[in-house]
Amino acid sequence: MADEQHKQDLFIKQQCTNIFRERRPMRLPAELNTITAFAIVCFCFFPASGAADDPKSQPFPQPPSKKGLQVQMVDDAIALGIHHAGININLTALFQPAANDNTIRFSYDGREWLMNGAYAASLDNQIRPLSEKGIVVYVILLAYPSRDPARDAVMLHPNAGGEFTIAGFNTASDDGLRTYRALIAFLAERYSGRHAEHGRVWGWIVGNEVNSQKIWYNLGAMPMKDAASEYEKAVRATHDSVREHSDHGRCYLSFDHFWTGRMPGVSDQESYPTREFLVEFARIARERGDFEWHIAHHPYPDDLGNPRTWLDKLATLSDDSPHITFKNLQVLCEYLKKPELHWNNQPRRIILSEQGLHCLQNEEGETLQAAGFAYVWEKVARQHGIDALIWHRHVDHAHEGGLRLGLWTNKPGTVSEPDRRRHIYELFRKADTDEWPAAVTFALPIVGLESWDAISP
């Protein structure tokens, strides 16, 4: 009976995909039971209460699968059957201190702002083909240093310093915060769904791994409560700008796998346990007037260089676990059930917006990576609080500390030019299809399970 229900669920998903993504006609076989047929018709043709033709009031999409990817090659991503996509946006590149031939002039907050038209067009080329296929697009909002002092003075947090990859947004000065609001307003309007030529964005991830801010959201040395306060200003500004154009667009806080632990070798003024940071952020948000925000978590294994995440020792089932990795995702789901963290009496939603498994350079490397993905997929499928698993990476990247996380290898001598597909590629394609159960039986003895049902929900 369970197998039959599973087949019917997959059939419903496929029919809805045919209708919404491929624009193919619905085909209901004569033997399909009445309840299943009714479910398909209701899901596909009767929108949720309150839905309207106006893009602003459309509800947040509920795609039939959690499968997602940080996309490098759009056509390949679509062929893989993804329903969620992550796209990086470098706000420093979008902002222009002075006009040139490609400038877009944008009026907001009583003044004119200059946007990099060429960069905006490059974002369109990534976002539009994905959203046209019904894929839910999430953007990761980042501030990379440009080495242009005038630009960086506006965009980067003035306390940022030392060696870092990404800076915190400049929420410390009036000019910086106004500029940030204008940039988000520009993007929110452009990708609101009113302009088919640009595409649509539904999810807005603010910064990157802010609990480990020294490297990934540099605010300089400051106590955790001050860092949470600065970050709250950026998230609130994002939410307010997005909601001007989308009643149900979502904003997300970005955290890495350190839960009660924190980044080793870094001071407690530059890295913080996620749990403490989250509680402080929520307190500040309530104090200033609560608003809707959600979680974008990165559950990498304990050791990013070891794909055997099922063996993670620092990921326990305790609320005091040092890490939250793939192995113990339920800890985060349970923690968000605390009433003081709720929004509208419901737990905040979770997406897994960046994570992958390293491919070892030995004869078992590809098999271990693929087996790890099978374990991850089965684990995520059982977590009802998680909406999306957005895999990282599409293609190996030469400047990622020696990690090889891709579905594709990169060509030797290139940074990220695709070379060949790994074993994990076909497994990823088969996820959430009727090919999946047979494709992952090889992984059970590798991860030490007799059945996927043995995975803790």
Regions picked out by a protein language model, each given a short descriptive name:
Residues L183, A188-E189, R200, D226-E366:
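Noncatalytic carbohydrate-binding groove/subsite architecture in carbohydrate-active enzymes
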Residues L69-A79, F186, R190, R275-R283, ...:
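Short, acidic/polar
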Residues K67-L69, A85-I87, V137-L141, W204-V206, ...:
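Hydrophobic faces of well-ordered beta-strands that scaffold small-molecule active sites
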Residues E163, R200, V210, I215, ...:
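Aromatic-rich peripheral "rim/lid" segments of glycoside hydrolase catalytic domains that contact
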Residues E22-A37:
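Bacterial N-terminal signal peptides that target proteins for export
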Residues T36-F45:
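Bacterial N-terminal signal peptides
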Residues H83-F106, G110-P264, D302-D303, H397-G401:
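Substrate-binding cleft and catalytic face of glycoside hydrolase catalytic domains
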Residues D53-A93:
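Boundary/entry segment of secreted carbohydrate-active catalytic domains
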